[in-house]
Amino acid sequence: EALGYEPRVDTVSVPIAYAGMRNNDFDVFLGNWMPSMASISDPYIERGEVERLVANLEDAKYTLAVPQYVYDAGVTSVNDLAEHAEQFEQRIHGIEAGNDGNELIQQMIDDDAYGLGDWQVIDSSEAGMLAELSARVPNEKWMVFLGWEPHPMNTNFEMAYLSDADDYFGPNLGGATVYTNTRTGFIESCPNVGELLSNMTFTLEMENQLMSAIMDEGVEPREAARDYLSAHPDVLEAWLEGVTTRDGGDALPAVQSAL
């Protein structure tokens, strides 16, 4: 807005986001998680209806995790879990039933992978799983759970991700890269906005902080973003490099003034 544009933010499902870009209803989608969204996004990209602009977040994670004290005790891989079945009560704590993460855990159990055939996945919710973790950590009770980053859990708890679950969660600790997508032709029609979008990349630390402010402290998203950019002028400078206001003015002072 400080650059002179009038953006509109719509919260929609992933399939609707891609159909909307194809139909010119939406211009930009910042949440193309790959490879998990490949089956949805790739057909639009292959047909030339959507363009993949830039990777805006790298090294995201999604796999099993433990408190740091459990990791320090020698449980660093999913291969170490069965050896400590008693401490873990043969339970892997997940989130809501039917979630893809829970389904992957159940598949591990069904396959008797890593010696986990007689374990069980505990269906709960994100809040319920983290409440259980909060209750166990003060007494250093053992627990293995579904973890992911970015998420405030990474700053609220000392935790570590378990290696070697590649066959189920994928390589690099269930690694994902998030891309910015645009409707085909948008960058050519709005090159200045395209420059901004190309510059807008995020880090895990940044997103963990922002999500914690919003989810744990109740800060409004717009206010959380404003606070972060005010405290990190280097990020703002990098995002606005080569960008002008809509009428061709200097972008940086315009945005700094709005902050």
Feature-to-residue mapping (PLM):
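Ligand-binding cleft/hinge of the Venus flytrap
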Residues: 1-5, 80-120, 230
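Pocket-flanking alpha-helical
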Residues: 13-47, 131-132, 152-157
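Extracytoplasmic/secreted envelope proteins and their assembly/folding machinery
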Residues: 18, 78, 102, 106, ...
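Ligand-binding pocket segment of bilobal, Venus flytrap-like solute-binding proteins
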Residues: 26-30, 97-166
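A conserved helix-loop-strand patch within extracytoplasmic ligand-binding domains
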Residues: 47-97
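A bilobed periplasmic-binding-protein/Venus flytrap-type ligand-binding module shared by bacterial periplasmic
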Residues: 61-71, 175-189, 212-213
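C-terminal lobe and pocket-closing loops
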Residues: 150-201
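C-terminal functional modules
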Residues: 200-259
